């Protein structure tokens, strides 16, 4: 199984790059984790946000390999505590399909992305900045992996 993070935005602050890269390199070779960045649509004063979201959504879905499980990151999604996420990760491994996690831009995800998802995951009831979500997802998935392998990273 491979994990893929598909996120809107290509120019992230250094702290995002550093934090995400730190967790990315920790993943074992048998659980590769890749990042696919989608350029954000230009948002000006009179921008058609619905059209921008639709275009971003098309690009995100085009980046998902056929057969992948799609999991959106969205406030109304399921709130998984860490042990539950570890169980979820094990189920995904047993399913054998790759998993693509979708993180929207400033206005969230396109309706087509939400409609195409098999699952939706909420990190918090708070609205989080989309760059921060990248780091939180990477850390959460790494922690879940550490639980499934009895790695000492996670402590109760």
From Swiss-Prot:
Subcellular location(s) of the protein: Cytoplasm
A Pfam cross-reference name: SPOUT_MTase
SUPFAM superfamilies: alpha/beta knot
Enzyme class (EC, first level): transferase
Predominant localisation class: cytoplasm
MF (Gene Ontology): rRNA (pseudouridine-N3-)-methyltransferase activity
Residues noted as binding S-adenosyl-L-methionine in the record, renumbered to the chain: 73, 104, 123-128
Keywords: Cytoplasm, Methyltransferase, rRNA processing, S-adenosyl-L-methionine, Transferase
Disulfide bonds listed in the record: none
CDD domains to which the protein is assigned, alphabetical: RlmH-like
EC number in record: 2.1.1.177
Catalytic reactions of this protein: pseudouridine(1915) in 23S rRNA + S-adenosyl-L-methionine = N(3)-methylpseudouridine(1915) in 23S rRNA + S-adenosyl-L-homocysteine + H(+)
Cellular component, GO, one term: cytoplasm
HAMAP family attached to this UniProt entry: 23SrRNA_methyltr_H (MF_00658)
Protein family per UniProt: Belongs to the RNA methyltransferase RlmH family.
Annotated function: Specifically methylates the pseudouridine at position 1915 (m3Psi1915) in 23S rRNA.
NCBIfam families cross-referenced by the UniProt entry: PRK00103.1-1, PRK00103.1-4, tRNA_RlmH_YbeA
Subunit structure of this chain's protein: Homodimer.
PANTHER family given in the database record: METHYLTRANSFERASE (PTHR33603), RIBOSOMAL RNA LARGE SUBUNIT METHYLTRANSFERASE H (PTHR33603:SF1)
Protein name: Ribosomal RNA large subunit methyltransferase H
Taxonomic lineage of the native organism: Bacteria, Pseudomonadati, Pseudomonadota, Gammaproteobacteria, Enterobacterales
